[in-house]
Amino acid sequence: MTTIAPIIRLHRIPTDVSQPYICIEGPDRKLWFCESGASKIGRFDPAINSFDEFALPEPAAMPIGITPGADGNMWFCAKKANKIGRITTKGAITLFPLPTADAGPDGTLVGPDGNVWFSEGDAGKIGRITPAGAITEFQDGITPGSRPLSIVPRDNSIWFTEAAGNRIGRITLDGHVTEFPIPSHDSQPRAMTLHPDGSLWFVETNTNALGRVDRDGKITEHPVTTAQASLRGVCVARDGDLWFTENAANKIGRMKPDGTMVGEYPIPVATAGARCITGWRDGRLFFTAFDAGMIGEVSPGCRRYWSVSGPTGAKRILL
């Protein structure tokens, strides 16, 4: 079967040198993202291609990770400010200082307990914050200097990548840690995502592969086609395929859940600096172009849009 190449579009963020990092869908069905270079939280409405930006109260906070919380707000990691932030869909911001100095919070997602969990890459800890702002940190069992990074809940536990430790970690809700070594040496695992079949997938930035973690912690590795592509982000699309960003190769890649490569597709702007990628409810995907200061839009196997006008404006439907 012939696979139709995706359409890739770019949307420029209003603020220069915004350096967008993590992006994810919010409770308002809009794409929220961190502007690490501008110390802002951004929001993109895919229905009308419009942006909103919310400045943080600290000008060099360096927001990185962001996630919707169980309370209907967005929560984010302010790495340089050493704080966890909360922003309402109206733009009201609250910052919560971390107990550990220079912890370097990075990745975050809401856990099965309704709390927001996050990594402290510089401190080598995993943290948890309640909707009320109470923070707990866990360190026992995590290899020192391992740099925990991406956070994903699975099976009533929190799983995380250890970018410098070459391991995948698992922490129970009460703080018990288990680590699983990655077969390849110095693979530098970064972003991770949960597949509907229960497996975890992560990028290996140094060894140019996607890794898969089964429910027992067994890890298999699947190489991508382009050498030294510098994989950064990964997500699962509506069709179950894995889509990922190739930072150095300036491409978006696609892989089947059995490890078969489907294709790699050039990003139509030089040196985009593709980082995070996330799936959307209608089958599209969105990614952050860190170096270009843009939000990328991927329409898999789609040739055109059907535009529909209504009382609330124009909407686009994928064909």
Predicted regions mapped to residue ranges:
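A short beta-strand motif characteristic of beta-propeller blades
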Residues: 9-13, 50-56, 93-98, 135-140, ...
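Sequence/structural signature of beta-propeller modules
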Residues: 1-5, 301-319
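A short loop-to-beta-strand structural motif that recurs across blades of beta-propeller domains
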Residues: 40-42, 82-85, 124-127, 167-169, ...
